């Protein structure tokens, strides 16, 4: 919004050229989202408390968590407000990637809000049924996947629909240009061609998978928000490189016109996340709930797809991956042993993985900070793929 205003008034005030610089707008988006979160946080927490939207705690979990019962949840609304305002103020609203990321983020946010609402109203920690949640995630994820298959392939906004129709007329057999290939980290100028169907399948898996992985990780005070901020900031760097014809050529990455604008979104997400951490750090005054976790995970997955860094997201988001795998392994092994031996057996003391460490004697704050440190190391490793190729 401010970019369009600056471009319109640029002839009358030369200092407005500052608003056309991507890095300046990214810094301002971070500050804007951070200030909004810090200022509005107490008010949002009071409102959530008045609405009696307290978190229900599993009785079979660590006993130290029982004191958290009643802590306001659905605080992810605060994050989404900061992201929305900062992105709309400082982003280029003609950029197609901004809008598709916003659609996925807030679409998944709505799913999470409904899930949280049911948990609060019906006092049921399970919320929406897994089938219902997965269905709506799939609707949004598939729409985004189909759209991105052609918008990543085409530099011109107008021709995205034309490209889609050309694919339909080809009998759904048309390929995609090289910039839509799956990039392999650490390998210079080597990528794997996906085709339209492969791109759609991978994109769907990344977006929906990232959303649920972040949601599973959100179980301790401050645990998930800092990894989201770190991974989001790292993806913002990739977006800046991919969106620049100069830097992408120098670093031997495909140039994706318009991708650089995602730095604004990632910066806004970082600022909003840090503001939320102010109130979510131990002992938490508010939890983000599914409204925040599902939305942020979907956002990370969508940005990773646009900048063609799906594998790097898998690396940098290693904590999310480990948490998800711990649940999958626990459930699978329990069902197998129950069928085989008549009683279910567990690999971990409790899943997701952070609860296993808690029950192993780690304090909550130890688990949280150590997971942060691991994520920081993984993000630095992921960023090294910019040059180590």
UniProtKB/Swiss-Prot annotation:
Official protein name in the record: Phospho-N-acetylmuramoyl-pentapeptide-transferase
Subcellular location(s) of the protein: Cell inner membrane
Keywords: Cell cycle, Cell division, Cell inner membrane, Cell membrane, Cell shape, Cell wall biogenesis/degradation, Magnesium, Membrane, Metal-binding, Peptidoglycan synthesis, Transferase, Transmembrane, Transmembrane helix
Reaction catalysed by this enzyme: UDP-N-acetyl-alpha-D-muramoyl-L-alanyl-gamma-D-glutamyl-meso-2,6-diaminopimeloyl-D-alanyl-D-alanine + di-trans,octa-cis-undecaprenyl phosphate = di-trans,octa-cis-undecaprenyl diphospho-N-acetyl-alpha-D-muramoyl-L-alanyl-D-glutamyl-meso-2,6-diaminopimeloyl-D-alanyl-D-alanine + UMP
The organism's place on the tree of life at top rank: Bacteria
Keyword Cell cycle attributed: yes
Membrane topology type: Multi-pass membrane protein
Positions of transmembrane segments: 25-45, 73-93, 97-117, 135-155, 190-210, 222-242, 258-278, 286-306, 311-331, 366-386
UniProt GO cellular component terms: plasma membrane
Protein's GO biological process: cell division; cell wall organization; peptidoglycan biosynthetic process; regulation of cell shape
Organism: Burkholderia pseudomallei (strain 1106a)
Gene name as annotated: mraY
